[in-house]
Curated annotation (Swiss-Prot):
This is Metal-staphylopine import system permease protein CntC. Disruption phenotype: Deletion of the cntABCDF genes decreases nickel and cobalt intracellular levels and decreases virulence. Induction: Repressed by zinc. Nickel/cobalt import is reduced in the presence of zinc. It comes from Staphylococcus aureus (strain NCTC 8325 / PS 47). The gene is cntC.
Amino acid sequence: MIILKRLLQDKGAVIALGIIVLYVFLGLAAPLVTFYDPNHIDTANKFAGMSFQHLLGTDHLGRDILTRLIYAIRPSLLYVFVALFVSVLIGSILGFLSGYFQGFVDALIMRACDVMLAFPSYVVTLALIALFGMGAENIIMAFILTRWAWFCRVIRTSVMQYTASDHVRFAKTIGMNDMKIIHKHIMPLTLADIAIISSSSMCSMILQISGFSFLGLGVKAPTAEWGMMLNEARKVMFTHPEMMFAPGIAIVIIVMAFNFLSDALQIAIDPRISSKDKLRSVKKGVVQS
């Protein structure tokens, strides 16, 4: 509750949360928000300008851009939520087992993580696309295969830190069950860390699925997706540049929202982190990358 109170005192975090909630609502309630079919082709009305009927105009096939932008939230954001949830779930279970019990269990899980992290996520995704073909489901599968190991390592480090604390040692001394110790004394402390790495990971996953769709390797046509919309707009970017603005701005806004939320979570958990320290760490990360 203290962390939530600090988070809500940050105006940037509140705005970021509002944007994320708005995106999720629009994605889930897309049929109620817009009355157009995102895949309805009307060549007689192609490249129509902004109007009351089409607030953002139409594309090269006469499809309403705003409608496709809203429906594109589902593969671009909601599918990523599913992949992130499964990845965090697998990584958390293995991370808790590895960090708490250590020994042989820790060595076995860490070697499995080493194997998975030895392959770049883009290489794994391309391999799955080559084996099973294009589609959002294959990209989601690649997210899960590559991300769980990273989450496992981060959560393991956090669990090992809390396992060495005095209150956990006292709980072991009085004979408390291991699962009960994890559930009551360690899990609540690690939830904040999990929330931070999850929110920061969302940005790269959104950019990755949009990037693959932009290259024609992601979501299959005619399903609306931001990266695919950018690819379609690329062909007419000099004659109708406005077609690129809508999906591009949508991606930038949601990625910035998750970035702000991740930074705000870190400050809410550790108020000693100042804006100056945060700016310095961001610059250092940019230089290293």
